[in-house]
Protein backbone atom coordinates (compact mmCIF):
# COMPACT_ATOMS: atom_id res chain seq x y z
CA UNK A 1 0.00 0.00 0.00
CA UNK A 2 1.16 3.49 -0.82
CA UNK A 3 2.31 5.94 1.81
CA UNK A 4 2.02 9.68 1.28
CA UNK A 5 5.76 10.19 0.89
CA UNK A 6 8.00 7.13 1.09
CA UNK A 7 6.80 5.18 -1.91
CA UNK A 8 6.45 8.27 -4.05
CA UNK A 9 9.95 9.43 -3.11
CA UNK A 10 11.39 6.01 -3.84
CA UNK A 11 9.83 5.95 -7.28
CA UNK A 12 11.13 9.40 -8.12
CA UNK A 13 14.64 8.45 -7.06
CA UNK A 14 14.92 5.26 -9.08
CA UNK A 15 12.99 6.12 -12.24
CA UNK A 16 15.12 7.47 -15.06
CA UNK A 17 14.81 10.85 -16.76
CA UNK A 18 11.77 11.82 -18.79
CA UNK A 19 13.39 11.02 -22.14
CA UNK A 20 14.57 7.59 -21.03
CA UNK A 21 11.17 6.81 -19.57
CA UNK A 22 9.39 7.86 -22.74
CA UNK A 23 11.64 5.65 -24.85
CA UNK A 24 11.20 2.72 -22.50
CA UNK A 25 7.46 3.21 -22.44
CA UNK A 26 7.35 3.24 -26.23
CA UNK A 27 9.33 0.00 -26.39
CA UNK A 28 7.09 -1.65 -23.81
CA UNK A 29 3.98 -0.67 -25.72
CA UNK A 30 5.39 -2.17 -28.91
CA UNK A 31 6.17 -5.42 -27.12
CA UNK A 32 2.72 -5.52 -25.56
CA UNK A 33 1.04 -4.78 -28.89
CA UNK A 34 3.01 -7.64 -30.45
CA UNK A 35 1.77 -9.98 -27.73
CA UNK A 36 -1.81 -8.95 -28.38
CA UNK A 37 -1.37 -9.44 -32.13
CA UNK A 38 0.01 -12.96 -31.69
CA UNK A 39 -2.61 -13.89 -29.12
CA UNK A 40 -0.23 -14.45 -26.21
CA UNK A 41 -2.20 -15.54 -23.15
CA UNK A 42 -1.49 -16.20 -19.51
CA UNK A 43 -2.14 -19.60 -17.96
CA UNK A 44 -5.15 -18.54 -15.90
CA UNK A 45 -4.25 -20.13 -12.57
CA UNK A 46 -3.33 -16.75 -11.05
CA UNK A 47 -5.52 -13.65 -11.27
CA UNK A 48 -2.99 -10.90 -11.95
CA UNK A 49 -3.16 -7.33 -10.66
CA UNK A 50 -0.73 -4.43 -10.27
CA UNK A 51 -0.44 -1.51 -7.85
CA UNK A 52 -0.62 1.72 -9.82
CA UNK A 53 1.48 3.78 -7.39
CA UNK A 54 4.62 1.94 -8.54
CA UNK A 55 4.15 3.50 -12.01
CA UNK A 56 3.20 7.03 -11.01
CA UNK A 57 4.75 8.71 -14.03
CA UNK A 58 2.54 6.79 -16.46
CA UNK A 59 -0.97 8.30 -16.84
CA UNK A 60 -3.78 5.99 -15.76
CA UNK A 61 -5.35 5.58 -19.21
CA UNK A 62 -2.01 4.74 -20.79
CA UNK A 63 -1.22 2.37 -17.95
CA UNK A 64 -4.57 0.59 -18.30
CA UNK A 65 -3.87 0.01 -21.99
CA UNK A 66 -0.46 -1.45 -21.14
CA UNK A 67 -1.92 -3.60 -18.35
CA UNK A 68 -4.48 -5.09 -20.71
CA UNK A 69 -1.75 -5.86 -23.21
CA UNK A 70 0.29 -7.71 -20.60
CA UNK A 71 -2.76 -9.74 -19.60
CA UNK A 72 -3.52 -8.15 -16.24
CA UNK A 73 -7.07 -8.28 -14.95
CA UNK A 74 -6.79 -5.48 -12.41
CA UNK A 75 -5.06 -2.21 -11.57
CA UNK A 76 -5.37 -1.54 -7.86
CA UNK A 77 -4.92 0.75 -4.88
CA UNK A 78 -7.07 3.26 -6.70
CA UNK A 79 -10.04 5.38 -5.59
CA UNK A 80 -13.71 5.37 -6.52
CA UNK A 81 -13.09 8.27 -8.90
CA UNK A 82 -10.85 5.99 -10.99
CA UNK A 83 -13.46 3.26 -11.48
CA UNK A 84 -14.92 4.60 -14.77
CA UNK A 85 -11.47 4.53 -16.38
CA UNK A 86 -10.90 0.96 -15.26
CA UNK A 87 -14.32 -0.04 -16.56
CA UNK A 88 -13.51 1.53 -19.93
CA UNK A 89 -10.61 -0.90 -20.32
CA UNK A 90 -12.37 -3.92 -18.83
CA UNK A 91 -10.20 -3.93 -15.73
CA UNK A 92 -11.09 -4.50 -12.09
CA UNK A 93 -9.73 -2.76 -9.02
CA UNK A 94 -8.87 -5.82 -6.95
CA UNK A 95 -7.97 -3.73 -3.88
CA UNK A 96 -9.72 -0.39 -3.41
CA UNK A 97 -7.93 2.35 -1.47
CA UNK A 98 -9.00 5.52 0.32
CA UNK A 99 -9.61 4.60 3.97
CA UNK A 100 -9.24 7.67 6.23
CA UNK A 101 -6.02 7.89 8.23
CA UNK A 102 -4.03 5.72 5.87
CA UNK A 103 -1.31 3.46 7.21
CA UNK A 104 -0.29 5.41 10.31
CA UNK A 105 -3.65 6.27 11.86
CA UNK A 106 -5.93 3.26 11.73
CA UNK A 107 -8.33 0.98 13.52
CA UNK A 108 -6.21 0.50 16.64
CA UNK A 109 -7.38 3.92 17.85
CA UNK A 110 -11.02 4.08 18.96
CA UNK A 111 -11.22 7.75 18.02
CA UNK A 112 -10.69 6.81 14.36
CA UNK A 113 -13.56 4.36 14.15
CA UNK A 114 -16.43 6.68 13.27
CA UNK A 115 -14.74 8.16 10.20
CA UNK A 116 -13.53 4.75 9.05
CA UNK A 117 -17.00 3.23 9.42
CA UNK A 118 -18.46 6.16 7.50
CA UNK A 119 -15.98 5.55 4.69
CA UNK A 120 -17.07 1.93 4.43
CA UNK A 121 -20.75 2.90 4.55
CA UNK A 122 -20.23 5.24 1.61
CA UNK A 123 -17.69 3.29 -0.42
CA UNK A 124 -18.70 -0.36 -0.10
CA UNK A 125 -21.97 -0.07 -2.09
CA UNK A 126 -20.07 1.54 -4.99
CA UNK A 127 -17.35 -1.11 -4.89
CA UNK A 128 -20.05 -3.80 -4.93
CA UNK A 129 -21.85 -2.13 -7.83
CA UNK A 130 -18.69 -2.36 -9.92
CA UNK A 131 -18.15 -5.96 -8.83
CA UNK A 132 -14.78 -5.34 -7.20
CA UNK A 133 -13.77 -7.74 -4.40
CA UNK A 134 -11.74 -5.94 -1.71
CA UNK A 135 -11.21 -2.71 0.22
CA UNK A 136 -7.99 -2.11 2.14
CA UNK A 137 -7.64 -1.01 5.76
CA UNK A 138 -4.82 -0.62 8.27
CA UNK A 139 -4.10 -1.19 11.94
CA UNK A 140 -2.24 2.09 12.39
CA UNK A 141 0.99 2.56 14.34
CA UNK A 142 1.51 1.31 17.88
CA UNK A 143 2.62 4.61 19.44
CA UNK A 144 3.34 2.68 22.67
CA UNK A 145 0.06 0.72 22.52
CA UNK A 146 0.35 -2.95 23.49
CA UNK A 147 -0.38 -5.55 20.84
CA UNK A 148 -3.24 -6.91 22.94
CA UNK A 149 -4.89 -3.50 23.20
CA UNK A 150 -4.37 -3.00 19.48
CA UNK A 151 -6.10 -6.29 18.76
CA UNK A 152 -9.03 -5.38 20.96
CA UNK A 153 -9.47 -1.91 19.48
CA UNK A 154 -9.18 -3.13 15.89
CA UNK A 155 -11.72 -5.88 16.57
CA UNK A 156 -14.19 -3.35 17.99
CA UNK A 157 -13.97 -1.23 14.86
CA UNK A 158 -14.02 -4.13 12.44
CA UNK A 159 -17.12 -5.62 14.06
CA UNK A 160 -18.86 -2.38 13.06
CA UNK A 161 -17.52 -2.62 9.51
CA UNK A 162 -18.11 -6.36 8.99
CA UNK A 163 -21.93 -6.18 8.65
CA UNK A 164 -21.51 -3.61 5.86
CA UNK A 165 -19.03 -5.85 4.06
CA UNK A 166 -21.25 -8.89 4.55
CA UNK A 167 -24.30 -7.08 3.18
CA UNK A 168 -22.52 -6.09 -0.03
CA UNK A 169 -20.29 -9.19 -0.32
CA UNK A 170 -17.08 -7.16 -0.34
CA UNK A 171 -14.05 -8.25 1.71
CA UNK A 172 -12.26 -5.83 4.03
CA UNK A 173 -8.52 -6.57 4.04
CA UNK A 174 -5.99 -5.36 6.59
CA UNK A 175 -2.50 -5.24 5.12
CA UNK A 176 0.44 -6.89 6.82
CA UNK A 177 3.39 -4.47 6.59
CA UNK A 178 6.96 -4.60 7.86
CA UNK A 179 7.93 -2.33 10.74
CA UNK A 180 11.69 -2.87 10.31
CA UNK A 181 12.37 -1.02 7.06
CA UNK A 182 9.38 0.79 5.57
CA UNK A 183 6.69 1.38 8.18
CA UNK A 184 8.28 1.89 11.56
CA UNK A 185 5.94 1.17 14.48
CA UNK A 186 3.11 -0.29 12.34
CA UNK A 187 1.11 -2.70 14.49
CA UNK A 188 -0.14 -5.35 12.04
CA UNK A 189 3.41 -6.43 11.27
CA UNK A 190 3.29 -10.19 11.89
CA UNK A 191 0.98 -12.77 10.36
CA UNK A 192 0.30 -14.27 13.81
CA UNK A 193 -1.16 -10.95 15.02
CA UNK A 194 -3.24 -10.56 11.86
CA UNK A 195 -4.61 -14.09 12.07
CA UNK A 196 -5.54 -13.52 15.72
CA UNK A 197 -7.47 -10.42 14.63
CA UNK A 198 -9.35 -12.38 11.97
CA UNK A 199 -10.33 -14.92 14.59
CA UNK A 200 -11.59 -12.23 16.95
CA UNK A 201 -13.66 -10.49 14.30
CA UNK A 202 -15.12 -13.79 13.16
CA UNK A 203 -16.39 -12.67 9.76
CA UNK A 204 -15.64 -14.24 6.39
CA UNK A 205 -15.66 -10.68 5.05
CA UNK A 206 -12.61 -9.64 7.06
CA UNK A 207 -9.28 -11.09 6.01
CA UNK A 208 -5.64 -10.13 5.50
CA UNK A 209 -3.67 -8.75 2.60
CA UNK A 210 -0.56 -10.90 2.83
CA UNK A 211 2.31 -8.84 1.45
CA UNK A 212 5.10 -11.28 0.60
CA UNK A 213 7.78 -8.59 0.51
CA UNK A 214 6.85 -7.22 3.92
CA UNK A 215 6.48 -10.61 5.60
CA UNK A 216 9.78 -11.90 4.23
CA UNK A 217 11.43 -8.98 6.03
CA UNK A 218 9.53 -9.59 9.28
CA UNK A 219 9.35 -13.37 9.59
CA UNK A 220 10.32 -15.28 6.43
CA UNK A 221 8.97 -18.84 6.14
CA UNK A 222 6.64 -17.62 3.38
CA UNK A 223 5.41 -20.90 1.89
CA UNK A 224 4.81 -22.58 5.25
CA UNK A 225 2.91 -19.52 6.49
CA UNK A 226 0.70 -19.51 3.40
CA UNK A 227 -0.03 -23.23 3.75
CA UNK A 228 -0.93 -22.88 7.42
CA UNK A 229 -2.99 -19.68 7.21
CA UNK A 230 -4.27 -19.31 3.64
CA UNK A 231 -7.89 -19.26 4.81
CA UNK A 232 -7.18 -15.85 6.35
CA UNK A 233 -5.45 -14.39 3.26
CA UNK A 234 -7.72 -12.75 0.68
CA UNK A 235 -5.04 -11.06 -1.44
CA UNK A 236 -1.29 -11.13 -2.06
CA UNK A 237 1.33 -8.50 -2.96
CA UNK A 238 4.81 -9.09 -4.40
CA UNK A 239 8.13 -7.27 -4.16
CA UNK A 240 11.80 -8.17 -4.38
CA UNK A 241 13.76 -8.57 -1.14
CA UNK A 242 15.88 -6.64 -0.41
CA UNK A 243 15.06 -3.33 -2.06
CA UNK A 244 11.44 -3.83 -3.19
CA UNK A 245 12.50 -3.91 -6.83
CA UNK A 246 12.04 -6.51 -9.58
CA UNK A 247 11.12 -10.03 -8.45
CA UNK A 248 13.63 -11.83 -10.69
CA UNK A 249 16.94 -13.47 -9.74
CA UNK A 250 18.36 -10.19 -8.45
CA UNK A 251 16.57 -10.83 -5.14
CA UNK A 252 16.22 -13.67 -2.65
CA UNK A 253 12.62 -14.92 -3.01
CA UNK A 254 11.56 -17.80 -5.25
CA UNK A 255 8.34 -16.30 -6.55
CA UNK A 256 7.53 -19.20 -8.88
CA UNK A 257 7.50 -21.57 -5.91
CA UNK A 258 5.49 -19.11 -3.80
CA UNK A 259 2.88 -18.81 -6.56
CA UNK A 260 2.66 -22.59 -6.90
CA UNK A 261 2.08 -22.78 -3.16
CA UNK A 262 -0.71 -20.19 -3.42
CA UNK A 263 -2.35 -22.07 -6.30
CA UNK A 264 -2.19 -25.34 -4.36
CA UNK A 265 -4.26 -23.80 -1.55
CA UNK A 266 -7.14 -23.32 -4.00
CA UNK A 267 -6.82 -19.54 -3.92
CA UNK A 268 -9.16 -17.75 -6.35
CA UNK A 269 -8.33 -14.12 -5.51
CA UNK A 270 -5.71 -11.77 -6.93
CA UNK A 271 -1.93 -11.51 -6.76
CA UNK A 272 -0.72 -7.94 -7.33
CA UNK A 273 2.74 -6.83 -8.41
CA UNK A 274 3.91 -4.13 -5.97
CA UNK A 275 7.59 -3.81 -6.74
CA UNK A 276 9.24 -0.53 -7.74
CA UNK A 277 10.88 -1.02 -11.14
CA UNK A 278 14.59 -0.26 -10.96
CA UNK A 279 15.40 -0.74 -14.63
CA UNK A 280 14.72 2.02 -17.19
CA UNK A 281 11.77 0.20 -18.81
CA UNK A 282 9.19 -0.17 -16.03
CA UNK A 283 6.56 -1.87 -18.17
CA UNK A 284 9.03 -4.51 -19.33
CA UNK A 285 9.80 -5.18 -15.66
CA UNK A 286 6.07 -5.49 -14.96
CA UNK A 287 5.63 -7.92 -17.83
CA UNK A 288 8.55 -9.98 -16.52
CA UNK A 289 7.09 -10.03 -13.00
CA UNK A 290 3.71 -11.23 -14.25
CA UNK A 291 5.46 -13.93 -16.27
CA UNK A 292 7.39 -15.14 -13.23
CA UNK A 293 4.16 -15.39 -11.24
CA UNK A 294 2.12 -17.01 -14.01
CA UNK A 295 2.69 -20.60 -12.93
Where do the language-model regions lie?
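Histidine-acidic metal/acid-base catalytic patches
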Residues: 2-68, 132-133, 188-210, 214-295
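Active-site mouth loops of central-metabolism enzymes
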Residues: 49-57, 104-115
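Catalytic domains of carbohydrate-active enzymes, especially glycoside hydrolases
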Residues: 63-82
Amino acid sequence: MKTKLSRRSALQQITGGAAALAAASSLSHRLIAADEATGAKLKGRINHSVCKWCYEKIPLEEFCQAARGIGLQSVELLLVKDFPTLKKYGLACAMVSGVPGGINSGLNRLENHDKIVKFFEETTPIVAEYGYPNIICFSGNRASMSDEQGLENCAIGLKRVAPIAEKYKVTVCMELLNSKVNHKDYQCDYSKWGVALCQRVGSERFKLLYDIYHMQIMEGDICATIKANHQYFAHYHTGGVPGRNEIDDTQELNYALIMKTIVETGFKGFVAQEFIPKRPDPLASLKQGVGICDV
